[in-house]
Each structure stands twice: as structure tokens, then as C-alpha cells.
């Protein structure tokens, strides 16, 4: 399904860009305050989670449905978990996400950004 392909690429790129570039800059919190809003975090987490589940069920151009889009699915799932953590922190609620995942937010952001670029360039490749 092509719409889920583009949704996966867009959400992985947005999550990767936010986690790697914007979180390292302190002035981005003042320039783009909506990026740190609870509603934005929840919407991006839900879209990323939906795209990850749909990519696992419906791969693009692969013969093995479970293994077809493994890397974008993993990137979308971890991005969903990280932004659910941001949502819980913004609402001052305890987060169900493990600290080890949150500690590696920047490398996971790089993984998500790389997954979106590679998935955009090499869509029919198996395991990507």
C-alpha cells in the first residue's frame, strides 16, 4: 500500500530530524514550541506506530510479508515509543518506556533518519 509507504517515510524522517537536529539545539525550543507540545508528540507517535504496524503487515514489493520492511518497521516502532515517552513527560505522568531506550534517543533518531532515506531510495529491496 503506497500511502503507508509514504507515511512511514515521512514519520521516520520527521522523528529522525527532531531527535538528531532539533533536540541538540537549545534555540529550537523557542523557535518551534509546538514540537515539544504533548499533542504533537501524541499525534506523531500514533502515526508512526500505525505506519510501523501497516508496514509489517503490508510490505512494498517484497515476497516475504513478515520480513519485507524490517528496518522501517523497527525505526517506526522505536520512534513511536520515544514520542510516547515525550507525551507522558509533557503531561507529567510516569512513562512506561524503559530508560535505556530514552538514553539512546539521538542514535535512534539517526537510525530513523537513515531508515527513511534508505527506504525512500530503495523501496522494493528485501529487508529494507
Curated annotation (Swiss-Prot):
It is a multi-pass membrane protein. Coiled coil: none annotated. The chain crosses the membrane at residues 2-22, 34-54, 64-84, 108-128. Its main location: membrane. Keywords: Cell membrane, Membrane, Transmembrane, Transmembrane helix. The keyword Isomerase does not apply. The keyword Magnesium does not apply. GO terms for cellular component: plasma membrane. It is found in: Cell membrane. This is Uncharacterized protein TP_0070.
Amino acid at each position: 500500500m503506497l500511502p503507508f509507504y509514504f507515511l512511514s517515510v515521512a514519520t521516520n524522517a520527521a522523528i529522525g530530524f527532531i531527535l538528531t537536529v532539533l533536540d541538540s539545539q537549545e534555540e529550537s525550543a523557542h523557535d518551534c514550541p509546538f514540537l515539544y507540545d504533548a499533542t504533537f508528540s501524541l499525534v506523531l507517535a500514533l502515526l508512526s506506530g500505525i505506519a510501523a504496524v501497516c508496514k509489517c503487515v503490508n510490505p512494498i514489493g517484497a515476497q516475504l510479508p513478515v520480513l519485507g520492511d524490517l528496518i522501517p518497521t523497527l525505526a517506526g516502532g522505536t520512534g513511536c515509543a520515544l514520542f510516547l515517552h515525550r507525551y507522558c513527560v509533557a503531561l507529567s505522568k510516569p512513562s512506561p518506556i524503559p530508560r535505556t531506550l530514552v538514553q539512546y534517543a539521538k542514535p535512534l533518531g539517526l537510525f530513523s533518519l537513515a531508515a527513511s532515506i534508505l527506504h525512500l531510495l530503495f523501496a522494493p529491496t528485501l529487508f529494507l
